[in-house]
């Protein structure tokens, strides 16, 4: 999916400070390269078997026990492993107040952040 359309968006809200952040950017999929090899090597052995599942995550299964990854072939598990790296190019920051709200936007220009206050 990300190889066809690398756009991503994140939404965060902190109820204590009443701050909402929306961020946009793009993602790069790393598969069987130096990035994935380094991440795989750093991963605890006990976690690697989780990538050996035959059905993809979210696939319907008839029996809940089929959702447990078997210990087994590390090469097969690594074949299912990928690392996603992303960069943010736009941030929309909104602070909600009882009497007023404040909002700012930040756009990455390729070398610096352009920032502007905008109407909430």
Where are each of the predicted segments found?
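Charged, gly/pro-rich active-site loop segments
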Residues: 19-120
């Amino acid at each position: 999916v990300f190889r066809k359309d690398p756009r991503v968006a994140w939404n965060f809200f902190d109820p204590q400070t009443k701050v909402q952040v929306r961020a946009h950017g793009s993602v790069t999929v790393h598969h069987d390269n130096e990035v994935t090899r380094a991440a795989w090597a750093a991963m605890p052995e006990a976690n690697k078997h989780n990538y050996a599942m035959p059905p993809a995550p979210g696939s319907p299964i008839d029996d809940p026990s089929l959702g447990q990854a078997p210990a087994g072939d590390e090469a097969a598990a690594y074949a299912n492993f990928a690392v996603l790296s992303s960069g943010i190019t736009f941030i929309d920051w909104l602070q909600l107040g009882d009497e007023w709200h404040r909002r700012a936007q930040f756009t990455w220009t390729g070398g610096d952040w352009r920032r502007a206050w905008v109407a909430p």
